[in-house]
């Protein structure tokens, strides 16, 4: 036998692939594809972290996209108007059911304009209820975020917000079991 694929001819490589498939090996499944796939997936996982979505896997996202747009797969979702239907439907669902506030004001601090911050704030409300004292609630939220991200609230990155959303999402799903 040969020790490297480089030493094999194309016929020999295909024989190896066939032998592996015969033993049950399958190629790794590709993730969602297309120009709007990442945004849709991020929103879908956010909805899952808010407790709205029961199935976070790609087939569930694809079923949602098909219901909203009539398009079978995100790889065929090329028209921004079609993508907007699915994106806005997800955002609307999060606003209605989880009270995610997507509005922006000119006096809003930069950190609060980040989608992850908006979702984390909604998660915080789900877990803690409406604030009795807005200032105290904000300080508790700020402390929670900064202790987990090791970063000041005003310097939080999108990636750091993902970690916060995942932590809060675990807590929300634990409550709903």
Stretches found by the model and what they are:
Residues 1-177:
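Interfaces that engage single-stranded nucleic acids at replication/repair/recombination sites
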